[in-house]
């Protein structure tokens, strides 16, 4: 039995290919899925009137409590949707939100993959065809990470 981590962008996690891959791997392994939601977070920020900004490391910049709440709400919605989808399949779903005490710390899902890398035997990051080269560059120094596009 292996420890397997899968991170799926919010644009991918609703696909049948993603679901089948995760369920197949979960049959014989311990499976953790990190949900994404970048596109949906951006849409929610725009709807609320916020400018979407990223830092030099590609992480979303949040300056206000409300922005962090928007991120949290989107990610928790994605997490709950995936949990419902994988009920009874032996899959643990988490969102990229950390808490330091009671302080909410949304973290980029790719950064969370890097942080968890030491504890997993296999890691898969799912993205879109349009983003695969960028995603491969993000993980080029992480040999356990396999980037897949749907």
Spell out what each predicted region is.
Residues 1-150:
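Nucleotide/pyrophosphate-binding catalytic subdomain
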């Amino acid at each position: 039995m292996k420890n397997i981590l899968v991170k799926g962008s919010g644009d991918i996690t609703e696909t049948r290919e993603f679901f089948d891959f995760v369920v197949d791997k979960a049959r014989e392994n311990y499976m953790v899925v990190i949900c994404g939601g970048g596109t949906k977070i951006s849409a929610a920020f725009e709807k609320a009137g916020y400018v979407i900004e990223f830092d030099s490391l590609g992480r979303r910049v949040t300056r206000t409590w409300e922005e962090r709440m928007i991120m949290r709400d989107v990610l928790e919605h994605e997490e709950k949707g995936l949990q419902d989808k994988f009920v009874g399949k032996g899959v643990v779903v988490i969102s990229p939100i950390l808490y330091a005490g009671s302080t909410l710390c949304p973290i980029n899902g790719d950064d969370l993959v890097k942080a968890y890398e030491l504890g997993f035997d296999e890691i898969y990051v799912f993205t879109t065809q349009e983003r695969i080269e960028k995603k491969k560059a993000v993980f080029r120094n992480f040999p356990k990470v396999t980037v897949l596009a749907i």
